[in-house]
Amino acid sequence: MNRKKLLRLGIVLYSLCIVCFCFTPQPQLPTGVETPGIQTIGRLVFLLTPFNSLWNLGEVTSPIQLFWIFLQNALNVLLLFPLIFQFLFLIPSLRKTKRVILLSFLLSLSIECTQLVLDFFFDFNRVFEIDDLWTNTLGGYLAWILYKLLHRTR
């Protein structure tokens, strides 16, 4: 299998992982773990405070809650990293900072909006988070930086 076919397969498989991770019903949080700053409209759930994890850090009541918040942010940074990294190898026209940031942001916004639609129709217990937009976009940007670093040494 040549490199382009392998990259395409990787993109398809990782996209399926994103679908499973982001668009399936989310279980309730473990007992004692709550996210500060949550707002609800009907069964739609929003976290619209930018940098919510930092602003509401004083409301964290346990080490488990603190770990959960850190883990959630770290996973959001990593969510689009592999996908964007593979796109960079496959699509030369994407290899500009503005394009990477725009694609990462639009993918993240699409994920968040799709979660809202799924919650509206099927009550999947998902949350539209402003912080997901910037953390996912940061992950795409970090993929771009790694790509540039790897190609600088060639």
Segments (PLM) and residue ranges:
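Bulky hydrophobic segments
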Residues: 1-125, 141-154
